[in-house]
Amino acid sequence: MSGLRLIVVSGLSGSGKSVALHTLEDAGYYCIDNLPVSLIGELARYAQNRDAPTGERFAVGLDARNPPHDLQCLPETLTALREQGIATEVLFLYAEDSILMRRYSETRRRHPLAEGDQPLADALRAERTLLEPLREVADWSIDTSRTTVHDLRGLISERVAGERSGLSVLVQSFGFKHGIPTDADYVFDARCLPNPHWEPQLRAYTGCDDCVRAFLESQPETEILFGQIDTLIRYWLPVHQQAGRSYLTVAVGCTGGQHRSVYLAERLAESLQEGCSHVSLRHRELS
């Protein structure tokens, strides 16, 4: 192994690629944005031939302005780099079209693929098509539709912090009425549990508060559901590790993402601390 590590950051314009690269730069990566795909091999050779410290890390940003043929050939390039002993990973960022259009409206920036009076929706559609080869080979995808800049930086920082010590697990709570996290590897439904929302004295609290915890723990169904989720995840974690996975996202949802899912996510994250190299916790609807 060469000791080099390369992260390719790509995704839809407006989904947070610049934030991702800045976060990696702060974490000690040497970052290059808008690098042509054809030069990735040259960058790898440069890094291998110079007197670089062991474990040096690079990150490159790629977008849809690369020639379509180059984007289609990227998977072959990445395979060649891995065969050379370079630890290579692809991070793909995306968001719903309505969110991207709103972000462009707020920043008044022009989409890189927009030509003349072409509608933004057409440019976004073309970009999704061009970048599909990257999304298909991504090791890690993040839907930033409901993710703040702070949240995105935190997710990437957590990933980088745990990249050298085995499997990292993100446990996330969410509300079904706000949409299922599309980047989750496992999704569990806690709506079968009694809802604290319908208890007037508990409605204003969350699953992080003792009063809600006490209510849920008094329900026999809660312990049964938690035990089944915890057992399933613990059973499959070693399998994911043996398969070479470095990151796993477990999502637990309830109706609004305030009580039941928050409680279960808190407990699951605490339970998984034993046996996992790195466990992080995020409450999407409480962010």
Swiss-Prot record:
Task: For this UniProt record, give its keywords in alphabetical order, as a comma-separated list.
Answer: ATP-binding, GTP-binding, Nucleotide-binding
Q: Which parts of the sequence bind GTP?
A: 63-66
Q: Does the keyword Flavoprotein apply?
A: no
Superkingdom of this entry's organism? Bacteria
Task: Spell out the SUPFAM superfamilies in the cross-references.
Answer: P-loop containing nucleoside triphosphate hydrolases
Q: Where does ATP bind?
A: 11-18
The reply on keyword rRNA processing is no
Q: Which one of the record's GO molecular function terms can you name?
A: GTP binding
What InterPro entries does the annotation carry?
P-loop_NTPase, RapZ-like, RapZ-like_N, RapZ_C
Query: What does this gene product do?
Result: Displays ATPase and GTPase activities.
Family of this protein: Belongs to the RapZ-like family.
Q: What is this protein called?
A: Nucleotide-binding protein Hhal_2130
